[in-house]
């Protein structure tokens, strides 16, 4: 049912947290098959987490719902069968658990490899899509993830905190310089420095 709605209504890969939605719209609408956020609310995937005079603020209620939701959605975003995505997630989890960060990153690369690139999307839009995919993949393996983490020298795309290590991730499409530009930005802006004193190995 969830994936049927995603396919029918469409989804740009943006996060479903802190979404404002008109109070009258949410109260007067029947089951909605045109607005994905409203559909997810009516299906129990989102809940009202706050309000203001005009809007309700929708968000994912808890970790269990987030895990259930994105374990279904990620296969559609990366255009791979559920079994393949599940295998990649298990590789990442096992590798991190065993302390093999390099192998974990290979599993992450395998997960996002061949993800369709739409010519209608700018490099920035595609970077946001990949950031969403990576963020939720890392969430599924048990990381606490900070997105667009602000530091004194810049803003880091993702900081993933695992039990035994911290991963600093910067994402750039080829049009924006790719891996070389991402590594240079991490180095020049010393993105790993703020986390060195936290008692865990820091990788980038």
Regions of interest found by a model, annotated:
Residues 179-183, 190-204:
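Nucleic-acid nuclease catalytic cores
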Residues 1-182, 188:
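Extended alpha-helical interface modules used as scaffolds for assembling large macromolecular complexes
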């Amino acid at each position: 049912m969830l994936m049927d709605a995603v396919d029918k209504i469409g989804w740009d890969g943006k996060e479903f947290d802190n979404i404002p939605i008109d109070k009258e719209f949410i109260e007067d609408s029947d089951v909605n098959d045109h607005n994905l956020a409203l559909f997810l609310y009516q299906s129990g995937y989102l809940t009202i987490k706050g309000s203001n005079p005009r809007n309700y603020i929708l968000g994912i209620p808890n970790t269990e719902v987030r895990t259930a939701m994105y374990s279904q959605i990620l296969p559609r975003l990366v255009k791979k069968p559920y079994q393949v995505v599940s295998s990649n997630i298990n590789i990442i989890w096992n590798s991190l658990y065993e302390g093999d960060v390099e192998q974990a990153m290979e599993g992450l690369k395998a997960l996002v490899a061949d993800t369709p690139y739409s010519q209608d999307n700018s490099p920035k839009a595609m970077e946001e899509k990949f950031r969403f995919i990576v963020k939720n993949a890392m969430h599924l393996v048990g990381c606490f993830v900070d997105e667009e983490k602000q530091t004194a020298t810049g803003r880091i795309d993702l900081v993933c905190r695992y039990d035994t290590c911290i991963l600093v991730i910067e994402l750039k499409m080829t049009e924006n310089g790719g891996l070389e530009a991402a590594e240079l930005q991490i180095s020049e802006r010393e993105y790993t420095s703020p986390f060195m004193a936290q008692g865990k190995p820091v990788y980038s």
